[in-house]
A protein has these predicted regions:
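Helix-to-loop junction immediately C-terminal to a conserved catalytic motif
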Residues: 45
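Q-loop/switch helix immediately C-terminal to the Walker
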Residues: 73, 78-94
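Hydrophobic anchor residue at the start of the ABC signature
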Residues: 126
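Catalytic Walker B motif of ABC-type/P-loop ATPase nucleotide-binding domains
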Residues: 137-141
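Helical segment within the ABC ATPase nucleotide-binding domain
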Residues: 151-164
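Conserved beta-strand-loop-alpha-helix hinge in the C-terminal portion
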Residues: 191-213
């Protein structure tokens, strides 16, 4: 169980999250929609230090070594090819199978990773994340920039991860979470506006619209 307790994050004068509390069971796919979703994932990974609140995994502070993170705008070291990145991933994750992932999310092996177009950089970042055996996986805007086929394949991979016993958090537009999450939260104005089970998607859309929460 990941517990987010009264999390508060400010960015200068702006409050991104204001006392957000969530209880996220293990071995499930959880969706996060609404304003502040990326800030929440960055706090879970330790890239943002909360102004207040706690994040725990099984009652203990969540550690970065337990978490894998695919950022919304992935960046790679200049000069490294896609093949170099995959070789490093296999070195740190023996037994992983990049070829199987590349069949679903293809990326040109001999291209420089940092020079790839946005969609291909996104696919590479997702492949590297999915090769990682971490207990918790964070996907920030994973569908942004993907073509229809790649987005479909990614949805199948996310469903597979949930069935394999991983805990996956997907920060995305509300419409993109339909059909892949066990439950999902909608944020707005820095707080949780609603929590919904997977079968309550239509209700979540109605309530988000009634609350004036725009899809971004």
């Amino acid at each position: 169980m990941i517990t987010i307790d009264a999390l508060r994050i400010r960015d200068g004068e702006r409050t991104l999250l204001d006392g957000v509390t969530m209880h996220l069971p293990a071995n499930a796919v959880h969706g996060i929609a609404g304003e502040g979703r990326s800030a929440l994932l960055r706090a879970l990974y330790g890239l943002v230090v909360p102004d207040a609140g706690r994040i725990t995994l099984g009652g203990h502070p969540l550690r970065r070594c337990d978490v894998g993170f695919a950022e919304a705008e992935p960046r790679f070291w200049p000069g490294l090819t896609v093949r170099d990145c995959l070789d490093l991933a296999v070195r740190y994750n023996p037994g992983s199978n990049p070829a199987a992932m590349l069949r679903r999310l293809p990326v040109p092996l001999d291209a420089e990773a940092a020079a790839l177009p946005e969609a291909e950089r996104k696919r590479l970042a997702l492949v590297l994340l999915l090769l990682n055996p971490k207990r918790v996986l964070l996907l920030d805007e994973p569908f942004r920039g993907l073509d229809v086929e790649s987005a479909f394949m990614l949805r199948q991979l996310i469903l597979q991860l949930g069935s394999e016993g991983r805990t996956v958090l997907v920060a995305a537009r509300l419409a993109e979470l339909d059909g892949i999450c066990d439950d999902f939260y909608v944020l707005g104005g820095g707080v949780v506006r609603g929590r919904y089970e997977h079968y309550e998607f239509a209700r979540s859309v109605r309530e988000a619209a009634a609350s004036g929460i725009a899809e971004k």
